C-alpha cells in the first residue's frame, strides 16, 4: 500500500523550500489542519511513504472540506482538472454505512468503489458527491493509516462529518509529489 521511499527533510532544507515565492509550508497538528479545512483552505498532506498505485490514500493527498458547495471548482482550479472528474471522500471506516450505500461492502481501503451517497447526506457533502450521487470512497481505520485516521477523526469531532475530500497531491497528468523540491 505505502511502498514509496520515506522522505525526511532537515530544518535547513525546509527553510530553503519556504523561501520560494508563493510557498507556504507548515508542520501542524490535526486541529490546525482541521481549522484550515473549515476555513476553505486547500491542504496538502506529505507524510511517510508514498502510495503505490493510482490513488492517493492519505500520504500524498490534497484535502478540502467536503461540505463546501463549490469545492470541486476550487480544487479543479488548482489542479487544472476537467470539471466532470469526480473527487473522492476518505471516511472513517466505522461511519461509512451512515453516509453511503455500502451494499455488501464492509470497507473500501484502496478507493476501488464508487458507492451511492445516502439521499439525506448528498447536500451535506456536495464536494465529494458526483452528478449521479455517487462517491468514490476510501474507508480509513487506525490500523491502515493512523495519522490520516486521526486527522479525519479530528475533522469529525469539529464538524460532525467523518469524511474529508481527498485527491492526489499532483497536477493533472503528473505523478504524485515525491519530494518537496
Predicted regions and their residues:
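Flexible beta->alpha loop and helix N-cap segments adjacent to enzyme active/binding sites
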Residues: 1-181
Amino acid at each position: 500500500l505505502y511502498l514509496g521511499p520515506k522522505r525526511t527533510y532537515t530544518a535547513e532544507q525546509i527553510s530553503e523550500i519556504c523561501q520560494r515565492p508563493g510557498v507556504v509550508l507548515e508542520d501542524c497538528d490535526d486541529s490546525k489542519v482541521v481549522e484550515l479545512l473549515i476555513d476553505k483552505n486547500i491542504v496538502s498532506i506529505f507524510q511517510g511513504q508514498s502510495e503505490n498505485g493510482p490513488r492517493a490514500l492519505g500520504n500524498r493527498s490534497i484535502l478540502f472540506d467536503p461540505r463546501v458547495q463549490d469545492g470541486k471548482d476550487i480544487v479543479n482550479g488548482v489542479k487544472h482538472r476537467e470539471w466532470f472528474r469526480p473527487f473522492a471522500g476518505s471516511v472513517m471506516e466505522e461511519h461509512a454505512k451512515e453516509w453511503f450505500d455500502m451494499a455488501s461492502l464492509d470497507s473500501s481501503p484502496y478507493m476501488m468503489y464508487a458507492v451511492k451517497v445516502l439521499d439525506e447526506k448528498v447536500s451535506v457533502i456536495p464536494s465529494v458527491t458526483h452528478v449521479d450521487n455517487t462517491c468514490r470512497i476510501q474507508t480509513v481505520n487506525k490500523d491502515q493509516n493512523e495519522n490520516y485516521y486521526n486527522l479525519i477523526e479530528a475533522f469529525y469531532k469539529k464538524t460532525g462529518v467523518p469524511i474529508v475530500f481527498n485527491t492526489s497531491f499532483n497536477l493533472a497528468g503528473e505523478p504524485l509529489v515525491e519530494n518537496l523540491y
